[in-house]
């Protein structure tokens, strides 16, 4: 099975590329979705997060208050490391399970949509690494406009991730998403053609 790592910094448009691949029938293993699943009420990771960051990261109904957690977890590299030490081992375990399930089912290619692919050294476990790249100021502009995030918060999150140049060095294929969405679609089509060539 061809393992494709899809990554890019926050606000790069990586999820849009994943959606385009999914629409073509490719299996997407979404690290962010797995990260949400492991902090559902009753999951051990949620209890550990409460222990580490306090009860006020919970909503009244017992679910995780994501902005509340983000406000505490992204204030320093130590706090971000604490968050990652709780969530990342569980994300890795569930990811491995999903890859194994896909392989057992005879899936020819699986796309691992993972923001921290290079940060965690997981690019080395992939057969093909695809990086979606956008200049930092453009990413900030998009995230402030589309998600209503504060500029300082966005820049802190970007700073907590591996620098773009390191991510780009790990890439087999770079998708430049500085332009219009049509340009992104054309590059996604070329990526799809490349994947299909490799799994024939």
UniProtKB/Swiss-Prot annotation:
Provide a GO biological process annotation.
coenzyme A biosynthetic process
InterPro entries per UniProt: Depp_CoAkinase, P-loop_NTPase
An example of a GO molecular function for this protein is:
dephospho-CoA kinase activity
Give the binding site residues for ATP. 11-16
Name the protein family: Belongs to the CoaE family.
Q: What's this protein's function?
A: Catalyzes the phosphorylation of the 3'-hydroxyl group of dephosphocoenzyme A to form coenzyme A.
Checking HAMAP family in the record gives: Dephospho_CoA_kinase
- Name used for this protein in its record: Dephospho-CoA kinase
Name the source organism: Corynebacterium efficiens (strain DSM 44549 / YS-314 / AJ 12310 / JCM 11189 / NBRC 100395)
């Amino acid at each position: 099975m061809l393992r494709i790592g899809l990554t890019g910094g926050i606000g790069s448009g990586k999820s849009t590329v994943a959606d385009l691949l999914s629409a073509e029938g490719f299996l997407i293993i979404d690290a962010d979705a797995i990260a949400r699943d492991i902090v559902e009420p009753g999951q051990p990771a949620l209890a550990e997060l409460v222990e580490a960051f306090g009860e006020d990261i919970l909503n009244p109904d017992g679910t995780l208050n994501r902005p509340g957690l983000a406000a505490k977890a992204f204030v320093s590299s130590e706090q971000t490391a604490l968050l990652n030490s709780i969530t990342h081992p569980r994300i890795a375990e569930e990811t491995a399970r999903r890859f194994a399930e896909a392989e057992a089912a005879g899936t020819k290619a699986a796309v691992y949509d993972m923001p921290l692919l290079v940060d965690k050294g997981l690019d080395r476990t992939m057969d093909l690494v695809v990086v979606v790249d956008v200049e930092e100021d453009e990413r900030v502009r998009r995230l402030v406009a589309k998600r209503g995030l504060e500029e300082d918060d966005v820049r802190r999150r970007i700073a907590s991730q591996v620098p773009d140049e390191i991510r780009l060095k790990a890439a087999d294929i770079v998708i430049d998403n500085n332009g219009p969405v049509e340009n992104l679609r054309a590059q996604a089509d070329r990526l799809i053609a490349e994947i299909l060539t490799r799994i024939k």
